Amino acid sequence: NQDFFIKMKPFENTKEGAGIVEKMIADVLADNHQFKYVVIGMESTGFYGVHLANYLSTSELLAPFSVRVYCLNPKEVKNYKKSFNDIGKNDGIDSFVIADFARVGRIAIKPWRGSQYLALQRLTRHRMHITECITREKTYMLNNIYLKFSEYALLRNGEHPFSNKYGATAEAILTEFTTNEDIVNSSIEELVEFINSKSKGRIADPEETAKIVQAAARNSYRLDKCLYEPLTISIASSFNCISSFEKELKAIDKA
């Protein structure tokens, strides 16, 4: 029978449990001066292993032994385990396999650098989350725009009156005119003045833009009047959400 320096026992995945593991390793090192450095291998388990890996890799007790923590791909460990004949499966055996995997130098990845890695990972994933929120909100809003202003929603890029479909002028057209009839009943001069005001004079041909918007309003499906206000409120709310998400995106990019 082979003797082990650490007797196998379970511990909770908590700060207290991590402290127990740290002390077990530190006690072995204190009693066995032949060990010059420590390699800790653990299967990568997503969030569940993050705190333990961080704790051990930054341990002051283990620091004098150049502790290196490796979060291993479970598939690699599983494949390595196949090299053992008639070996069972339990936590003790799996721990032995991981330790042997490290002992024979099979680890090819970089040691865990939790703080730097986790910071970048969280920021990158949150940025993706915000981007997906913007995309999802725009898709949701387009459904409401189609219900309220069907022809406007169907205009393609080459036909669309605004270069930015989600800009201030587009938002004003969709939220400040409650019904399509309000646009149809406005004169071209009134629409030109409105467009110039909302775009701050940045639209090259406001009269042509006004004509396109009015034609789209004229050709759109008509709804019962009771539907226009809820749709307008929903569209305005979506614009507010998109604006907030875009502000958050800028803040993340500056981080």
In which residue ranges do the predicted regions lie?
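A detector of single, family-specific signature residues
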Residues: 1-255
